[in-house]
């Protein structure tokens, strides 16, 4: 009995000692100071730069990097974190629109342990990179928005409007984009009536930036623009054809037409599949201008990372196979970036870090090491279709990270082309680029 009592007393003393250890006095005031560990006390920063990513699925890097087990080598946040020798944390959530991110940052309903951890990270971060706004557009009915855009542009021509940009901002933006947020005409037009529309992308974006600076006034804040993922067969634009089963059991398209309803509607406005990308870019750039306009109106607050422009430059410069190679930047859902797309986003962000004097000194060497390690671990086995030695030589001879990544992806990309599995029309097939499947079991 005495032994049990002694054990209990010792345990109580130990607990009290630990608790007292978390409280100290401020030497200038003799007031007690709470030294209870926070989430960040479990990080070993070791004097390194802390970079935090927050935003949507593009930043989260769950959809796109393939195989997912290589996310920490393919996703752009990891490439930048490792390559610059940063302490890095990704707090992005797939599917987030601007309103959801704003709510997460401000609403008391989200003040759980995970949200508290995110807040502490944002307060401590040296650099934050934000990826948002893409879902405000792409997660809604993009095909419908394209048709509505055609309608508005036609009205503009009929009315003889001279200033296309003003017309689009005043009419298209207020109507179409707020429909995208609400899908309810009365609520969507609330802002036009002078009421605050909490689902408006422009207002949300401004509030997000202000909130981040409230949390961390000294942070360097990078904001990505949204790339254009639209091609002539984009599932973002085209719904499936309307079909019916004939009396003999044969599935047929309505009106014996393999085109979808939306294809027909767009064609009525003189828009061919080859022009979907241009029309889609018209909408995407309206969304990107929210970021650019904020940067111009609030100088010194955000650094714009022009993902859109770099992707577009690559697309416009690529004329091989009817500009097919620019599709390598996208995963097979043709929405999210592929491994190669993530590498390009990393390149653009790294250029900005270099411009700001925030980049690590050994980025190129680190990227080369990552790619060579992957080659050795995943593709160096008997019978491998990848010439590992040649690929490593090309990587090590590269003078930029872009060249090193390109050498790697060229080596592991299969040369065969595959038609889209669910392609509706043979003459609308396009190549799908796939990677050599890693063989972890048989590597040397």
Q: What role is predicted for each listed range?
A:
Residues 1-9:
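Bacterial N-terminal signal peptides that target proteins for export
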Residues 365-444:
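Beta-rich interaction/scaffold domains
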Residues 50-55, 59-61, 87-92, 126-131, ...:
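Structural recognition of the beta-strand scaffold that forms the well-ordered cores
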Residues 100-196, 222, 226-239:
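Oxyanion-hole/transition-state-stabilizing segment in secreted/luminal serine hydrolases
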Residues 231-307:
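Substrate-gating cap/lid alpha-helix
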Residues 326-366:
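Histidine-centered active-site loop/cap adjacent to the catalytic His
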Residues 21-24:
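C-terminal motif of bacterial Sec signal peptides marking the signal peptidase cleavage site
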Residues 32-94, 119-120, 150, 416:
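Serine-esterase "nucleophile elbow" of acetyl-processing enzymes
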């Amino acid at each position: 009995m005495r032994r049990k009592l002694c054990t209990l007393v010792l345990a109580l003393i130990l607990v009290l000692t630990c608790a007292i250890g978390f409280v100290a006095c401020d030497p200038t005031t003799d007031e007690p100071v709470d030294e209870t560990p926070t989430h960040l006390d479990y990080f070993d920063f070791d004097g390194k730069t802390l970079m935090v990513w927050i935003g949507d699925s593009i930043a989260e890097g769950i959809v796109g990097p393939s195989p997912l087990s290589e996310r920490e080598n393919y996703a752009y946040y990891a490439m930048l974190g490792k390559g610059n020798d940063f302490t890095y944390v990704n707090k992005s959530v797939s599917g987030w629109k601007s309103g959801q991110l704003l709510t997460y940052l401000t609403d008391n309903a989200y003040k759980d342990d995970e949200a508290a951890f995110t807040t502490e990270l944002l307060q401590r971060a040296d650099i934050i990179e934000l990826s948002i706004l893409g879902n405000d557009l792409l997660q809604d009915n993009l095909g419908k928005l394209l048709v509505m855009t055609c309608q508005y542009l036609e009205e503009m021509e009929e009315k003889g409007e001279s200033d296309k940009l003003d017309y689009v901002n005043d009419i298209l933006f207020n109507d179409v984009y707020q429909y995208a947020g609400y899908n309810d005409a009365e609520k969507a037009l609330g802002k036009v009536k002078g009421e605050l529309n909490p689902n408006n992308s422009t207002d949300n974006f401004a509030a997000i930036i202000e909130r981040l600076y409230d949390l961390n006034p000294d942070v360097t804040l990078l904001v990505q623009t949204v790339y254009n993922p639209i091609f002539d067969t984009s599932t973002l634009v085209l719904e499936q054809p309307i079909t019916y089963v004939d009396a003999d059991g044969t599935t047929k398209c309505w009106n014996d037409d393999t085109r979808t309803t939306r294809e027909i509607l767009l064609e009525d406005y003189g828009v061919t599949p080859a022009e979907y990308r241009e029309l889609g870019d018209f909408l995407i750039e309206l969304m990107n201008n929210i970021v650019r306009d904020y940067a111009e109106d609030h100088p010194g607050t955000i650094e714009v990372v022009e993902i859109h422009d770099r992707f577009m430059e690559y697309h416009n410069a690529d004329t091989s196979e009817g500009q097919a190679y620019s599709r390598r930047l996208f995963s097979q859902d043709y929405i999210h970036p592929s491994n190669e797309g993530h590498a390009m986003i990393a390149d653009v962000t790294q250029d900005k870090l270099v411009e700001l004097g925030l980049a690590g000194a050994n980025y190129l060497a680190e990227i080369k090491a990552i790619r060579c390690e992957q080659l050795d671990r995943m593709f160096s086995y008997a019978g491998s279709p990848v010439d590992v030695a040649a690929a490593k030589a090309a990587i090590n001879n590269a003078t930029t990270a872009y060249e090193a990544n390109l050498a790697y992806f060229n080596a592991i990309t299969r040369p065969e082309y595959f038609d889209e599995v669910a392609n509706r029309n043979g003459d609308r097939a396009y190549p799908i680029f796939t990677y050599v499947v890693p063989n972890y079991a048989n590597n040397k």
